[in-house]
Regions:
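Conserved Walker B catalytic segment
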Residues: 74-148, 155-158
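Short amphipathic alpha-helical interaction segments
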Residues: 110, 287-304, 312
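A short helix-turn-beta junction within AAA+ P-loop NTPase domains corresponding to the substrate/partner-engaging
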Residues: 155-171
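Winged-helix-like regulatory helical subdomains adjacent to P-loop NTPase cores
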Residues: 10, 207, 211-291
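Conserved small helical "lid"/interfacial subdomain of P-loop NTPases
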Residues: 170-197, 204, 215
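Short, amphipathic alpha-helical interaction segments positioned at domain boundaries
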Residues: 247, 320-334
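Conserved NTP-binding/hydrolysis module of P-loop NTPases
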Residues: 26-32, 39-71
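Walker A/P-loop nucleotide-binding motif
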Residues: 1-20
Length: 334
């Protein structure tokens, strides 16, 4: 398929997978344009196509804080159509252009609608050439974003084309697979780790893709620093501590500070339970707020996949170590 939607919570490897798809497309002779879905996306895609480079990555990041008129978005879509068709003529039979769009939840609805029209038009333009399917040039769109916010996008009438996309949801990796990957990767690096130690490392990672990467790297570095060829339990413990610190800064901190003040107050109340599910009654008491207030922000945090229901009247974190981060870095002085 040439239309794909990759979803997953923070740190689950969406951007890594997006980059791998770009690499594979480039190796097969496709032109690749990658960008982040903030306002002005269509303009940046057009500029990238004008550059005529085989792979173009925009450095534009951040959420969209504005809206674009439907008319303006359509005009930009028409401009893109001409540039795409012009670029496709320069590619070999069966090749095409890949637009890899990260942070899809921050996209302008109008610009996504323009891309939807563009996608259909380019397919129609290629069908009109009369060439065999194998020789037609194509346009592929791959989007990556957070599940809850992408869910909102799928409800927009103007971007229903996304519902036809192949959807890939990234989540936790099974611990046996993590253990086996540690054993093999360490072996490939010229070191050794026994099954028991690799199993400990897998449990420390919780199967979270980013933590798997961090724990593996830091336990390896610990052994190398000690000039050893064998990774031991102490390396796993040291590596885990370093991994937690980096995970805090890369995942938990941006999430925490990206929430609204009432949402932060809500999850700060949850952090007091140290990893156990929290009673809604306790949140109301700790925050000194009403039932309706708690219900409102419970719903918003569940929608944004920060927390989830854990039974009747209970909630828990969905983001690894978020409660520990709040306790260690936010509430430590209290």
């Amino acid at each position: 398929g040439r239309l794909m939607l990759i979803t997953g919570n923070r740190g689950c490897g969406k951007t890594v997978l997006l980059r791998e798809l770009q690499r594979l497309a480039s190796e097969r002779g496709w032109a690749v344009v990658s960008d982040s879905a903030s306002l002005g996306l269509c303009d940046r895609l057009a500029e990238a196509l004008r550059s005529n480079k085989p792979v173009v990555t925009s450095m534009e990041f951040g959420p969209s804080f504005g809206r674009m008129s439907v008319e303006a978005a359509r005009a930009k879509g028409e401009t893109l159509r001409g540039l795409v068709n012009e670029r496709l003529k320069k590619l070999g039979p069966g090749k095409g252009i890949l637009f890899a769009i990260d942070e899809a939840q921050s996209a302008s609805i109008e610009e996504l609608a323009a891309l939807a029209v563009l996608y259909q038009q380019v397919l129609g333009d290629q069908d009109a050439t009369g060439l065999p399917d194998s020789d037609q040039r194509g346009l592929a769109l791959v989007f990556a974003g957070l599940p809850s916010m992408v869910d909102d996008l799928l409800e927009e009438p103007s971007v229903t084309f996304l519902r036809r996309a192949q959807q890939r949801t990234l989540g936790a990796i099974s611990l046996p697979k993590v253990r086996d990957s540690y054993i093999q990767t360490v072996k490939d690096a010229g070191l050794y780790v026994d099954t028991e130690t690799a199993d400990l490392a897998a449990h420390k990672s919780m199967g979270h893709p980013y933590m798997v990467q961090l724990v593996g790297y830091y336990m390896w570095r610990s052994a190398v620093r000690r000039n050893l060829q064998v990774i031991e339990r102490c390396d796993v413990e040291a590596g885990h501590a370093d991994a937690i610190s980096e995970f805090y800064e890369a995942v938990d901190a941006p999430l925490y500070y990206g929430l609204r003040s009432p949402q932060r107050l809500f999850i700060e109340a949850m952090a007091a339970d140290e990893g156990k599910p929290t009673r809604m009654a306790d949140i109301i008491e700790r925050c000194d707020r009403t039932q309706s207030w708690a219900s409102k922000y419970r719903a918003s945090l569940i929608r944004e996949r920060v927390i989830e229901a854990a039974g009747y009247g209970l909630v828990r974190f969905t983001v690894p170590m978020l409660g520990a981060y709040i306790s260690d870095r936010i509430l430590w002085h209290e």
